[in-house]
């Protein structure tokens, strides 16, 4: 929606060949949301807060009373778009998410349902894992609070499987949100190309993910164990060094699997963009690993 118009305006007014945006990786399902786009819960999926409900095909066919509810939720926060103060993403999402839930519950025609099923099949088990993490987050609470489910339960835990069965509608809603987000980012990219951009959207890949996020929980074997995080050594910018609090990929796992998880992540980003900027691109060759509790100054480069 808004991204689509932004790209079209940029193409017409600046004659630019591309527009670089901040990372649009997936965040938490409910507020409070992480304000930094460089600390996502998953780099494999999209940030659904960018969805524009009015651009979803089913919005146009909503029953009048349901559409009125969606519009009322929009109007409750729309005026803030014209204010000069920083946007309150939590307030916006608290209005947008129930509006999206109303559209989801209204259903789809057979053609659209088949498209949704195709998306789920193509996205594969990683989509199911992400939707499961979102469900656990919403029902059991944020994993960085007093809730211990992140550490005590794996994705194959019987309690997790039971939770998905009991709240399958919410599980399905989280998969649906990813489908809609992918459709709308694709539409934005096509809009940019149609208006003359050569590359269109340039996505930004964050250097890592939240240590308690979906990627780290669902597939711990992909990450280094022992509480290791990545950052950078002391320099003129920060003489103490920096600890970004993000677990690095396990290089042995990557090598043993032919870097499949990384290749799939890059491929998924190129599905919605003409180019990808890799934040801290030298991280492809080396990363500053920091042992838990020792501080950034006592880290070391791992290749």
Model-flagged regions — what are they?
Residues 198-261, 265-268, 272, 286-303:
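Substrate-binding/active-site clefts of carbohydrate-active enzymes
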């Amino acid at each position: 929606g808004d991204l689509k118009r932004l790209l079209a305006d940029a193409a017409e007014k600046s004659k630019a060949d591309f527009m670089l945006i901040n990372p649009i990786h997936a965040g938490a399902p409910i507020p409070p949301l992480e304000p930094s786009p460089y600390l996502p819960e998953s780099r494999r999926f999209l940030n659904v807060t960018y969805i524009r409900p009015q651009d979803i095909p089913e919005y146009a066919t909503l029953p009048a009373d349901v559409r009125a509810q969606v519009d009322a939720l929009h109007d409750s926060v729309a005026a803030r778009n014209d204010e000069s103060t920083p946007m309150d993403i939590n307030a916006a999402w608290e209005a947008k998410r129930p509006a999206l839930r109303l559209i989801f519950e209204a259903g789809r025609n057979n053609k659209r349902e088949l498209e949704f099923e195709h998306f789920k099949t193509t996205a594969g088990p990683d989509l199911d894992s992400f939707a499961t993490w979102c469900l656990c987050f919403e029902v059991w609470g944020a994993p960085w609070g007093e809730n211990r489910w992140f550490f005590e339960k794996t994705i194959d835990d019987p309690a997790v499987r039971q939770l998905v069965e009991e709240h399958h509608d919410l599980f399905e809603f989280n998969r649906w949100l990813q489908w809609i987000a992918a459709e709308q980012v694709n539409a934005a990219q096509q809009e940019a190309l149609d208006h003359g951009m050569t590359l269109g959207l340039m996505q930004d890949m964050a250097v890592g993910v939240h240590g308690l996020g979906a990627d780290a929980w669902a597939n711990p074997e992909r990450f280094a164990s022992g509480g290791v995080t990545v950052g950078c050594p002391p320099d003129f910018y920060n003489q103490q060094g920096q600890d970004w609090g993000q677990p690095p990929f396990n290089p042995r796992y990557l090598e043993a699997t032919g870097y499949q998880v990384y290749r799939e992540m890059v491929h998924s980003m190129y599905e919605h963009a003409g180019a990808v900027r890799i934040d801290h691109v030298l991280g492809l060759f080396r990363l500053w690993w920091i042992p838990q509790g020792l501080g950034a100054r006592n880290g070391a480069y791992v290749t």
